[in-house]
Amino acid sequence: MSGEKRKAMGITLPVENPAIEIFTKVIENSTYGPLAPAAQYKLGLALKSLLRYYEAEESFNKVISNYPDSELSEASKFQIASCRAAVSRGPDYDQGAAKEAKEKFEEFVREHPDATLSREAEKNVQELIEKDAESTYNIGRFYEKQKAYDAAKIYYEDVINKTPYSPWAEKALERMRLLEKRK
């Protein structure tokens, strides 16, 4: 726990992250002690900083379930949504994770409209909406390149209807005009 190296099968292994070990030990030694909620929350932050989003989300969920009266419970809800958003922004855009993140951010804003984090949550909702519009537009482009024009139109119309004032709606409208000229 103090940065000591561990051995496995005779091989010395470095400590991955001392903070994770420390926070885990605090929680194990005093699950309902006064430092446990902060340790659980900070464990989630440490995991999130290492891009271990699912584990971080689990840690934040434990803050909410084990310490519902903690002032960190509110921040944990925001962090859960943030983890979902991070997963959705990965190299393989995950529409399901993006939808979950958007719903969790919206729920956070509904439950905590005056919280400082609500402004950031609203900003994240807008970013997720934009990312979804971009993804839908790109699917339309894919179908257009495959000469599946009717399918492309469906996706372009979806972008226009869901996000009429976005740059992606403008692009989709332009593509629709080009498809109409093809006829």
What is the meaning of each model-derived region?
Residues 1-183:
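Acidic, polar-rich low-complexity tracts and alpha-helical solenoid repeat scaffolds
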